[in-house]
Amino acid sequence: MSVLLIEAFYGGSHKQLMDLLQEELKEECVLCTLPAKKWHWKARTAALYFMQTVPASANYRILFASSVLNLAELAALRPDLGKLKKVLYFHENQLAYPVQKCKERDFQCGYNQVLSCLVADTVVFNSAFNMESFLTSIGKFMKLIPDHRPKDLEKIIRPKCQVLYFPVRFPDVSRFMPEHKLAHLENVIGVKRNGDFYQREGLPGQQKSRALGGLMKNSNACRESGLCETQPGLCTTQHEGLHSPLTAAGRLNKSEASESTNPCQEEDKQHVTFNLCNIWSGMDYLQRPLHVVWPHRWEHDKDPETFFKVLLKLKEQELPFHVSVLGETFTDVPGWKRCIVAVTRCVPRPWCTRRSSQLNICILHLNSFLKGFRISARDQIL
């Protein structure tokens, strides 16, 4: 175990990166983590915790940690770890991170990241914007110090920095793709059919991705809980066993015979039949409505209010579109008023049905729309 992996906020993309590294390095690494709760407390106190819990070993050669950890503190508290080659990875930086409220920025968190960069041997950022926004903000950030300010820190840190894009392991979704796209993959990208799924030519055979299994598991749970009902133009959360447009149409015809006739439901079924057939056959591919996906967690730093302003602009111009809202939400839900406005103006039927021929909102792991209605009646006046 020559690589020591330390993650002070083991959740989300931080967890994904560490899990991938651990899977690739196998027995060559040891992983030490703290749960993804109370971010600011982890940033301030994680070094002291890891000082006591990281096992000592003469085999360590590399220390890899995210910027949540105060690397300078850990190196001072554990001299044996300070001697290692230290790699610091920035998922985000606190010098350019959006502030939720108009208040003074938490100086200590950004200051800790600057200290960590000075101690690290290599500093890695997940994007060029992340790197440049951090480096170019150091000078202005240090001016917050009343007097005796350090100088030229950017010049000291920049030579250590490089961009390494976040590694993404894509699930095998070929079973959901229309034939014309599968042909494109086969002819242009160099993937080859192998049984029920596609793989790159020349690579050894592999089982279907676990991520795909998780996707289908979440999809089934979502259908069973009633959160995702039939949505026009959205096929990724339904019809797990579909292999052709014929089976899709057959299932829909079967359901039509068994369900009570309702004008709204009949309209939805017609849209679903049309769109599913188009998806699987490739017909009218460019004519289908724009499908907008919100893949982020629902927090202030992702600016959900601007997202809803764009949706309302699309609606004002009478452009057809679908929306899929993904990701997790937390106790405080930002943009609640914009959510209510969007639902009120864009969804012509009662929200409880979660159906619309104009706007389809697929809620998988997000209930912020419903949480928005918990605001007091006075504040809900639009």
Swiss-Prot record:
Swiss-Prot/TrEMBL catalytic activity: queuosine(34) in tRNA(Asp) + GDP-alpha-D-mannose = O-4''-alpha-D-mannosylqueuosine(34) in tRNA(Asp) + GDP + H(+)
Listed GO biological process terms: regulation of translation; tRNA modification
GO molecular function, one term: tRNA-queuosine(34) beta-mannosyltransferase activity
Pfam family, one: QTMAN_N
Enzyme Commission no: 2.4.1.110
Localization per record: Cytoplasm; Nucleus
Keywords: Cytoplasm, Glycosyltransferase, Nucleus, Transferase
Major subcellular location class: cytoplasm
Any one Gene Ontology cellular component term annotated for this protein: nucleus
Family: Belongs to the glycosyltransferase group 1 family. Glycosyltransferase 4 subfamily.
Physiological role: Glycosyltransferase that specifically catalyzes mannosylation of cytoplasmic tRNA(Asp) modified with queuosine at position 34 (queuosine(34)). Mannosylates the cyclopentene moiety of queuosine(34) in tRNA(Asp) to form mannosyl-queuosine(34). Mannosylation of queuosine(34) in tRNA(Asp) is required to slow-down elongation at cognate codons, GAC and GAU, thereby regulating protein translation.
The name this protein goes by in its record: tRNA-queuosine alpha-mannosyltransferase
Organism: Gallus gallus
